[in-house]
């Protein structure tokens, strides 16, 4: 029993055929180019995707509740700026509890961190907190731009930190474009983008 959110990352003109009907996603050239439209599919859905090219994220979560299939156009996706100063970042709330009533188990957002800024600050966790209504595992999927330079490496990178209260996990890792990092427990943050 898994629900699904389909998010174009660097793909356009996507046809999605499901047991709930046909859907068309406009998509975008890349994650830094624009906010994108997206599609939610409930438990028990089947789908096939056809696109001209590029990447599409298929995000899933185990769920007991059923919500109807739902297409959301890009102009209806809420975008906010969180934090301030060097901890400011743009958050695109795709399928979050505040933006989508079906987000009971699945929670999908994009965070764009300007060069030199910190995200996931202050560090936070979604497990073992008294009174917290959610226990979330997270998957961070990193897309990082390139900076052409005569003397430097054009491949972008960032830093990501996770740790647990008991110290069983305490890692700071270098992340590059296309890396994924699983956070099943504990604090995560900061994520640091190098200066532009």
Regions found by a protein language model. Give the residues of each.
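Conserved hydrophobic/aromatic beta-strand scaffold that supports enzyme active sites
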Residues: 38-40, 58, 108-112, 120, ...
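A cross-kingdom feature marking solvent-exposed beta-strand/loop segments within repeated
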Residues: 22-36, 167
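Glycine- and acidic-residue-biased ligand/ion/polar-headgroup-sensing regions
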Residues: 2-23, 54, 115-116, 127-180, ...
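Extracellular structured ligand-interaction cores
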Residues: 36, 44, 53, 105-110, ...
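Short helix/loop capping segments that flank catalytic or ligand/cofactor-binding pockets
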Residues: 16, 49-51, 67-68, 121, ...
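A short, N-terminal "cap"/entry segment at the start of jelly-roll beta-barrel domains
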Residues: 1, 62-121, 130
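Conserved metal-binding segment of the jelly-roll/cupin
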Residues: 32-52, 61, 174-196
């Amino acid at each position: 029993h898994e629900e699904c959110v389909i998010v174009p990352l660097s793909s356009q003109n996507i046809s999605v055929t499901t047991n709930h009907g046909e859907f068309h996603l406009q998509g975008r050239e890349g994650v830094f180019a624009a906010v994108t439209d997206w599609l939610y599919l409930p438990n028990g859905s089947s789908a096939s995707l056809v696109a001209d090219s590029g990447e599409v994220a298929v995000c899933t979560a185990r769920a007991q509740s059923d919500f109807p299939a739902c297409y959301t156009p890009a102009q209806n996706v809420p975008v906010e700026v969180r934090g301030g100063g060097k901890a400011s970042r743009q958050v695109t709330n795709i399928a979050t509890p505040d933006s989508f009533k079906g987000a009971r188990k699945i929670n999908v957002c994009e965070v764009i961190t300007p060069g030199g800024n910190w995200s996931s600050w202050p560090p936070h966790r979604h497990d073992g907190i008294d009174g917290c209504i959610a226990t979330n595992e997270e998957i961070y999927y990193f897309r990082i731009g390139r900076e052409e330079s005569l003397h430097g490496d054009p491949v972008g990178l960032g830093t990501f930190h996770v740790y647990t209260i008991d110290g069983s996990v305490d890692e700071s890792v270098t992340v590059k474009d296309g890396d994924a990092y699983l956070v099943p427990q504990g604090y995560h943050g900061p994520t640091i983008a190098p200066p532009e």
